[in-house]
């Protein structure tokens, strides 16, 4: 797999792609959908994300130690799914993610602290139909470090 990564990087570089722009001065951490519905292997949507959650916990500690903004997202629907739109038709298994259930709560291993935002979303994107963009702009965030298990 390492060879594939190296050849891809070389291919990008030869075409003038893949350069880095660097980091800004006001970063935030966005943790996408590390809720029990996705991190519990017993859940129909779940998998074994122990390694990913552990790495995220380290990132989270660094952001918290630096007193930097941290935002979590979770997918959650009203019990009658009137807020689910066509997405629930596309992905019917999401119907287990009902507001107030344990499955929509953030995994205890990285549980939000008081003052950390939890954005409830209805679709794959953390930005579509949420106030996340406004929240980041209000904090003048210029760099977002994204981790999670259902990012898009």
Regions found by a protein language model. Name each.
Residues 35, 76, 124, 150-151:
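Catalytic metal-binding/acid-base residues of hydrolase active sites
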Residues 100-149:
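Internal catalytic-core helix/loop-beta-alpha segment
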Residues 1-113:
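Active-site acidic carboxylates
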